Amino acid sequence: MDNVQEHDPDTQEHNNETQNHKQEDHSNSYQTRTIPFIEPLSREYQKRIILCQTVNGPCPIIALSNALILKSNVDRPFELPKKRYITPDELTEYLVEFAKAYGLCKNQQSLQDKLTSMHFGQQLNPCLYDIEKFEYGHEIFCTFGVRLVHGWILSDDMGLSDEDLSYLRKLEYYEKVADTFAERRSLLEMQEPLTEQQQDFLNNSTCVDKVMENRYTMQFLTNAGLKKILELVGPGEIVVVFRSSHFSTMYSNPDSFAQFTLVTDSGYARTGEDVVWETFDSQTVETGNGELCAANFIPAVYVLNQRKEEKKKRAKDDEQYAKRLAKEEEERGKKETPKKASNTPRRNKSNTQKSRKQSENCLIS
């Protein structure tokens, strides 16, 4: 007789609570995925464990960590353990230990505090005329030797005149432009008459409206900014790019000299090698999104279409093979079928004679 365990409601409830607790823990952790990556020096594919992102907020520390993972080499390795999930505290500890091992920071407590805050975002104030210049917020990337760039560079292709560009250059940083925009809104909404100075301010700062109204439409990336990134990020280099309040790990493919950002959306974590990169080019400027690519930088749509065609071909081949087997089985069955026996039963001679004798003995004379 099989052993039957009695159902215990308290135990079941405890198991459910434990399971829910584990799920809750995972929801606060970073999922990992393994991707093949062409190591720039050896030019060979290597397996790298990277971090994925589920919610908004931790993209700065994820981009920084993934950049270190892709930059990892025998002289300065940085690898994540083979775990499906990494907690924020674990990631902070890995980064602090890495910095400690290579003498990247003297004040470890200060570094740990900065890294901890990066799980919730990172404030930056980019310069509108230099892709590598920030007023603040870039220091942590400098500590780990990871270049930080952005593509929000102002130019005449935004409909700005030379006078506009000259005025904006004096503001220099994005936050100063945003403050000027807010001041303009406030003056335009005033009911009382403006002073001559206030009116001059409004007349001279109209260009600010163009910049601020287009910032989300253009996703904080301009053609001038893209051109600068292509010029200054060398082949095989790995950097972090800041765009539209988001941080991404960027790789410059040494074979094509094209730029790609690492896809870290957890929704693609189980796509294997099919979706690993996203192009960073003029399409990104025009639409805000690049084209998804496989690990070998071939557009994912081609890879998926090819796989669909291969699947259809396999299904068709399997169907033809099944039909051929069925036909062979049918022909074999026809050859092995025995001749049909006669339906008329054979008469037993001895029994017939015996019956005749019995009949003769029963005759009545």
UniProtKB/Swiss-Prot annotation:
Region (Disordered): 1-31, 308-365
Pfam families for this protein: MINDY_DUB (PF04424)
Keyword Cell wall biogenesis/degradation: no
Biased composition (Polar residues): 340-353
Compartmental location: Cytoplasm
CC terms in the record's Gene Ontology section: cytosol; nucleus
Entry GO MF terms: cysteine-type carboxypeptidase activity; cysteine-type deubiquitinase activity; K48-linked deubiquitinase activity
Bias (Basic and acidic residues): 1-27, 315-339
Keywords for the protein's UniProt record, in alphabetical order: Cytoplasm
Predominant location: cytoplasm
Keyword Cytoplasm: yes
Alphabetized InterPro entries for the sequence: MINDY, MINDY_domain
Family per similarity comment: To yeast YGL082w.
Subunit composition and interactions: Interacts with sad1.
Protein name (Swiss-Prot/TrEMBL): Uncharacterized protein C12G12.11c
Origin species: Schizosaccharomyces pombe (strain 972 / ATCC 24843) (Fission yeast)
Lineage, opening ranks: Eukaryota, Fungi, Dikarya, Ascomycota, Taphrinomycotina
